[in-house]
C-alpha cells in the first residue's frame, strides 16, 4: 500500500467521524445506535496511524448526518474528534467537536438512589467537567467508563 492509497474508500454522502481515540470506534457506533442490523453502510478503521493521536479510530456513516445531540454525546468519549459532512464525495463542512456544559437525557446515573433511576418522569442531566460528568440531581461523578452509561437511542 502506498502513502497516497486510501485504506477505507470515500463515501458519497454522510458523515465521517475522524480523530477518535484508538479503541473507541465501537462505543461511537453504540452511541449512534448502529449495530449492523439496519443495513446502514458503515466503514470503521481502528488503531490506524495518526500524526496527532499516535493511533486513532475513524467511522464513516453513509447517508446520515449527525444531530447536534449526537455530536454532544460523542464529544464526551471522543473530545478530539472531527466531524466531516460529505456530499457528492466532497467534504462540505468540517469542525471539531466541542464539549457542551450539560447533557440531558443521554446518560444514566449509576447512583441507585438518584431520582433519575426511579420510576419518575425525570430525564437525567449531567454537568460536563474537565475529567468526567456530575449528575445535576444527586452529585454523583462519573470519571471512567463513561461510554457504559450512555443511553442514546
UniProtKB/Swiss-Prot annotation:
Keywords, ordered alphabetically: Metal-binding, Pyrimidine biosynthesis, Zinc
UniProt GO MF annotations: metal ion binding
Annotated binding of Zn(2+), by residue: 109, 114, 135, 138
GO BP: 'de novo' pyrimidine nucleobase biosynthetic process; pyrimidine nucleotide biosynthetic process
Top-level lineage group: Archaea
Single GO cellular component term: aspartate carbamoyltransferase complex
Subunit relationships: Contains catalytic and regulatory chains.
HAMAP family hit by this protein: Asp_carb_tr_reg (MF_00002)
Physiological role: Involved in allosteric regulation of aspartate carbamoyltransferase.
PANTHER family named among the record's database cross-references: ASPARTATE CARBAMOYLTRANSFERASE REGULATORY CHAIN (PTHR35805:SF1)
Family stated for the protein in its record: Belongs to the PyrI family.
Name of the protein described by the UniProt record: Aspartate carbamoyltransferase regulatory chain
Amino acid at each position: 500500500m502506498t502513502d497516497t492509497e486510501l485504506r477505507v474508500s470515500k463515501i458519497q454522502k454522510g458523515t465521517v467521524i475522524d480523530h477518535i481515540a484508538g479503541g473507541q470506534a465501537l462505543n461511537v457506533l453504540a452511541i449512534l445506535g448502529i449495530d449492523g442490523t439496519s443495513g446502514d453502510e458503515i466503514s470503521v478503521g481502528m488503531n490506524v496511524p495518526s500524526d496527532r493521536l499516535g493511533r486513532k479510530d475513524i467511522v464513516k456513516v453513509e447517508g446520515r448526518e449527525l444531530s447536534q445531540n449526537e455530536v454532544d454525546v460523542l464529544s464526551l468519549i471522543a473530545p478530539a474528534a472531527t466531524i466531516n459532512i460529505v456530499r457528492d464525495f466532497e467534504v462540505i463542512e468540517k469542525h471539531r467537536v466541542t464539549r457542551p456544559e450539560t447533557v440531558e437525557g443521554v446518560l444514566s446515573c449509576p447512583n441507585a438512589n438518584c431520582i433519575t433511576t426511579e420510576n419518575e418522569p425525570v430525564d437525567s442531566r449531567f454537568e460536563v467537567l474537565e475529567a468526567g460528568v456530575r449528575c445535576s440531581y444527586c452529585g454523583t461523578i462519573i470519571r471512567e467508563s463513561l461510554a457504559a452509561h450512555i443511553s442514546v437511542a
